[in-house]
């Protein structure tokens, strides 16, 4: 398991104590991303970008060792820490008033109803399906579609980076591949591990698909999210479920601030990455309440 840095844990504890002294407000368990994370990451005021980067943040980094020196100064409680980030409103993915409709129809209707949040219905169906799947196999994780959407936005703008779009089958019309992980441009050097099977590169690995899995990570976490018998890192249904399993690993409960932070930080070891995912997940939660 990737080790959550002691500095972050200390900051979360400081914020929790501060909240206890600030009028006794209680944070609801139902919050997807609770106010402690906002405070720890300085998200009281945050400019939210509306488009994904040209490429993913890049690659997995080495796990942080327990012995790593912690020289971070104590964190002052930032303004706005009492604000609770918005959580999804309305019916859960797949819910319906028509008991005779199949799950695909339910997910489509649910996604169509949330088109105003700024995510294509096809991507929303994948995120909603992943929430349903993980709720069934790892109910203690409390994974929400908004966390997956936050990651999908940062990684590839929901499978549309570079001007492509998602097809009806959930695959980008043009494949999405990150730069070669050859040790240049601050990327980790990862020689080819898949013979080019997933990323088309027989010299170095590349991040692949809507959620930018690198081949060796995909081999461990691959999933068949749409039941077509194929686990495809280019299929948003498959990668959304795989990402859900990755985030929920090691018994994490994403309704807890520290676990949510650890999960997203494990996906990419950058504080700026966690801030971006948080901001976009929070934005989608707020927009889901706007109608």
Question: Each predicted region: which residue ranges?
Answer:
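N-terminal export signals and maturation junctions of secreted/periplasmic proteins
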Residues: 53-135
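Terminal targeting segments of Actinobacterial cell-envelope proteins
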Residues: 1-26
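Catalytic glycan-binding domains that act on GlcNAc-containing polysaccharides
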Residues: 106-291
């Amino acid at each position: 398991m990737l080790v959550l840095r002691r500095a972050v844990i200390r900051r979360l504890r400081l914020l929790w104590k501060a909240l206890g002294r600030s009028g006794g407000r209680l944070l609801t368990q139902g919050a997807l991303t609770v106010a402690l994370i906002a405070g720890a990451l300085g998200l009281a005021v945050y400019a939210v970008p509306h488009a994904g980067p040209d490429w993913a943040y890049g690659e997995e980094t080495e796990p942080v060792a327990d012995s790593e020196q912690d020289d971070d100064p104590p964190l002052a409680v930032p303004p706005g820490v009492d604000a609770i980030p918005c959580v999804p409103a309305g019916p859960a993915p797949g819910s319906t008033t028509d008991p005779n409709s199949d799950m695909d129809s339910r997910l489509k209707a649910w996604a169509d109803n949330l088109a105003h949040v700024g995510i294509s219905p096809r991507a929303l169906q994948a995120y909603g399906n992943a929430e349903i799947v993980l709720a069934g196999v790892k109910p203690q994780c409390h994974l929400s579609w908004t966390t997956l959407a936050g990651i999908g936005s940062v990684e590839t703008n929901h499978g549309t980076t570079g001007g492509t779009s998602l097809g009806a089958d959930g695959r980008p019309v043009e494949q999405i591949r990150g730069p070669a992980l050859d040790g240049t441009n601050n990327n980790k050097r990862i020689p080819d591990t898949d013979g080019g099977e997933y990323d088309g590169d027989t010299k170095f690995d590349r991040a692949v698909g809507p959620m930018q899995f690198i081949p060796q990570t995909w081999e461990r976490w691959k999933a068949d999210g749409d039941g077509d018998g194929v686990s495809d890192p280019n299929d948003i249904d498959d990668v959304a479920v795989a990402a859900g399993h990755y985030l929920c690993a090691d018994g994490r409960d994403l309704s807890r601030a520290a676990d949510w932070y650890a999960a997203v930080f494990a996906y990419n070891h950058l504080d700026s990455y966690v801030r971006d995912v948080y901001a976009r997940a929070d934005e989608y939660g707020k927009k889901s309440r706007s109608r």
